[in-house]
Structures are given as C-alpha cells and as structure tokens.
C-alpha cells in the first residue's frame, strides 16, 4: 500500500463551498477584464497591431505585399512610412 501525500482529492476540492466562492468571483472577473482589454483598444496598443480602420490609409489602398527577397527591408520601410 502506498503512502498518502497529504493533498486533497480533486473531488473534495470541487465540491467544497470555498472553491466555488473563490471561483464564482475570479472567473467572471477574468472575463470582464479581457472584454475591457479588447473593447477599449488597449490590446491594439499593447501588442502593436493596427486597429481595423488603420489597415489601409488614404495614400495606400493596396495590400502591403513584400515581393523581393533581397530588398525586403526597404519594402518594409516603404510600407511602414505613412507619407
């Protein structure tokens, strides 16, 4: 017979009231925090991705496609330059 590690069983944890009191607060809080992170636009700023209205500018309406293998840095500079 093997020894006990002293840890609570999974069934004992998920049937406890303390587990559900804690998780009934944290799970909705994480959902609301994620929704606010995306809906306020902070996710665009943190990760540096363009907002949906910034993909195409007035001066550049085409797809920014890199075609050259050896001059790719120059093409990237041209695409990232708004003027």
Swiss-Prot record:
Q: InterPro entries of this UniProt entry?
A: PSII_cyt_b559_asu, PSII_cyt_b559_asu_sf, PSII_cyt_b559_CS, PSII_cyt_b559_N, PSII_cytb559_asu_lum
The entry's keywords: Chloroplast, Electron transport, Heme, Iron, Membrane, Metal-binding, Photosynthesis, Photosystem II, Plastid, Thylakoid, Transmembrane, Transmembrane helix, Transport
Q: Which cofactor does it need?
A: heme b
**What Gene3D superfamilies does the record tag this protein with?**
Photosystem II cytochrome b559, alpha subunit
Question: Is Ribosomal protein a UniProt keyword of this protein?
Answer: no
Looking at the UniProt entry, the stretches that span the membrane are 21-35
UniProt binding sites for heme: 23
* Protein location: Plastid, Chloroplast thylakoid membrane
Record's GO cellular component, any one? photosystem II reaction center
Q: What does this protein do?
A: This b-type cytochrome is tightly associated with the reaction center of photosystem II (PSII). PSII is a light-driven water:plastoquinone oxidoreductase that uses light energy to abstract electrons from H(2)O, generating O(2) and a proton gradient subsequently used for ATP formation. It consists of a core antenna complex that captures photons, and an electron transfer chain that converts photonic excitation into a charge separation.
Q: What name does the UniProt record give this protein?
A: Cytochrome b559 subunit alpha
Its source organism is Phalaenopsis aphrodite subsp. formosana
Gene name per UniProt: psbE
